Amino acid sequence: LAARIYYVGKDNKLYLLDSSVANTPTPLVDNVEDLQVEYGLALQSSYSASCFVGADKMVVTKAAGTSTCSAGAWSDVVSIRYQFTIRSSNKNLLPTAKEYLNVAGQTVTDRALRRTVSGVATLRNRVK
């Protein structure tokens, strides 16, 4: 079983740690300020996400079909919702500082350009 872990390092790079290749993180993208992932749970035998929860709400030992929005089973995950913010490497591109509320709820006032990308992806092997 291979595990692929994506995370943002302290150096603002998005990394991939792939256990099937090596235990050395591979940098993928520079200047990533934030990455958020939530899991879409299909409740009561439905095939679409009824709610989205963070990994902290997932319970490894929970039986399939018993998920709630406060405690989910990994086997009930049918989609993921992701959101990440990237910024320019030059922090002086804009003529004046712009107030920007990032994904983590922090106000940023430097002169860098930023873009937030978000989306939902269905896990096809989970939907009938």
Where would I find each of the regions flagged by the language model?
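Short linear sequence signals and composition-biased patches located at protein termini or domain-edge surfaces
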Residues: L1-A2, Y7-K128
